[in-house]
Amino acid sequence: MVVSCGISPRYSDIDAGAMAAAAIDEAVRNAVCVGVDVNKIAGLDNFCWPDPIQSEKTPDGKFKLAQLVRANRELERICRAYRLPCVSGKDSMKNDYGKGADKISIPPTLLFSLFGDHPDVRNTATSDFKNPGDRIYLVGESMDELGASEVSFMLKERGEAKGIGGNVPSLDNPEKLFKSYHSLSSAINSGLVLSLIHI
């Protein structure tokens, strides 16, 4: 049995839909990195949200509700692409404290947990190198997507950037990613991959 999770609350500062997609994808990548059978996975969605109801206390409630709708649309899109059923979940929708200018709200957040079958735990990849001279491969594509990343926040803190970046990672073709994950998991279980880490 493999258990993993994914969470990316900072992405909500730019796009709550991308935040949800990234959380699901991270949970899947974590599981794939140890060799989960991607045909035997299921997920749990846990929404932790600021008050999404328009009111005097929550003047931006419509925007927070729109973020929730966007996150749910991405939840459906990515889970369908990964053939990943959500078997349970939990929603906490009033994660705010205080009033007026002193009000503190959590960022719109989806914690996505995943569990799945591992055919043979003796064929599990770990993140450490095994031998001097091991080859390193980057699987997938790299894009201009550093928005809300650790690098963006570091540059802002150092005064080298005004905002938190531009584009957050987007999953434009999750079906293609899922094929890569399937191949990678098969390679791990065949003993071809000994070390693996998701980034």
Task: Please name every model-derived segment.
Residues M1-I197:
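Glycine/proline-enriched, intrinsically flexible loops and inter-domain linkers
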